[in-house]
């Protein structure tokens, strides 16, 4: 499977000329801008983790630049720094994470300590407070593979060889919708891009949409949000990530 670039470009997700009514809107941190980088997977998965914590009442805003810098140490990381949202989970467990205020620009040195609520943590210690090993499950829907078994997602960006649970598309859409309705963070990806799902909506014709938080800045008519129809979800989704708790509910 060939995978295109996810750098900032004109959106092909939100249909024009539609009026959207919000049905569910989950809490989220401000929309960020990945610029010309190919690191949408970092932004999308961090945004998913942030929304998950905000739904608990926690305040967390994480730095994508920390992970961008850390993956330079990975021998298998491509020069483009492309990856999968599951790669982000793997890298957080290995290198930790820091808050956005500690590293707001790519040229900022990676901090050795994270200060939170008067306490001092290593980035790895802080990471375990925002994303414990085994918290998340990766899902895909590939009718050429057995359902309810795990296998690698066969795309070049999966350079850490993460495993995904393969389920039917109807089940994938249903579990995604239920998770968003229950205020969980969900990460979505197609063959070109990844975004965090933060809400649900419908248009004047009754067609249903997932509201997605993009990482191309807050310009545009919806302040950096995209409206992805259920029809597009069915045809374009290659994978979804959510907590195991969200999946089991």
Model-derived features with residue positions:
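Cross-family signature of deubiquitinases and ubiquitin-like deconjugating cysteine proteases
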Residues: 7-10, 27-55, 70
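Active-site signature of cysteine proteases
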Residues: 7-11, 29, 113-249
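N-terminal regions that are enriched for targeting/export leaders
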Residues: 11-26
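Second-shell loop/turn segments in exported
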Residues: 26-38, 74-80, 158-166
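Active-site nucleophilic cysteine motif
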Residues: 34-49, 78-90, 193-194
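Structural recognition of the beta-strand scaffold that forms the well-ordered cores
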Residues: 39-42, 63-70, 88-91, 99-101, ...
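Papain-like cysteine protease catalytic cores
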Residues: 59-120
């Amino acid at each position: 499977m060939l995978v295109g670039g996810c750098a900032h470009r004109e959106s092909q997700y939100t249909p024009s000329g539609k009026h959207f009514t919000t049905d569910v809107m989950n809490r989220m941190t401000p929309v960020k801008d990945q610029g010309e980088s190919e690191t949408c997977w970092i932004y999308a998965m961090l945004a998913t983790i942030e929304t998950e914590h905000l739904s608990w009442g926690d305040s967390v805003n994480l730095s994508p630049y920390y992970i961008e810098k850390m993956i330079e140490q990975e021998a298998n990381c491509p020069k483009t720094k492309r990856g999968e949202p599951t790669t982000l989970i793997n890298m957080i467990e290995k290198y930790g994470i820091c808050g956005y205020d500690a590293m707001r620009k790519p040229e900022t040195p990676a901090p050795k300590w994270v200060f939170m609520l008067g306490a001092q943590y290593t980035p790895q210690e802080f990471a375990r407070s925002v994303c414990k090993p085994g918290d998340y499950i990766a899902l895909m829907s590939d009718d050429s593979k057995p359902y309810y078994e795990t296998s690698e997602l066969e795309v070049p960006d999966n350079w850490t060889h993460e495993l995904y649970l393969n389920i039917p598309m109807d089940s994938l859409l249903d579990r995604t919708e239920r998770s968003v309705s229950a205020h969980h963070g969900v990460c979505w990806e197609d063959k070109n891009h990844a975004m965090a799902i933060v809400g649900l909506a419908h248009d004047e014709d009754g067609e249903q949409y997932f509201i997605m938080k993009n990482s191309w800045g807050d310009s545009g008519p919806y302040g950096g949000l995209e409206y992805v129809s259920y029809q597009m979800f069915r045809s374009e989704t290659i994978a979804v990530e959510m907590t195991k708790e969200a999946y089991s509910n």
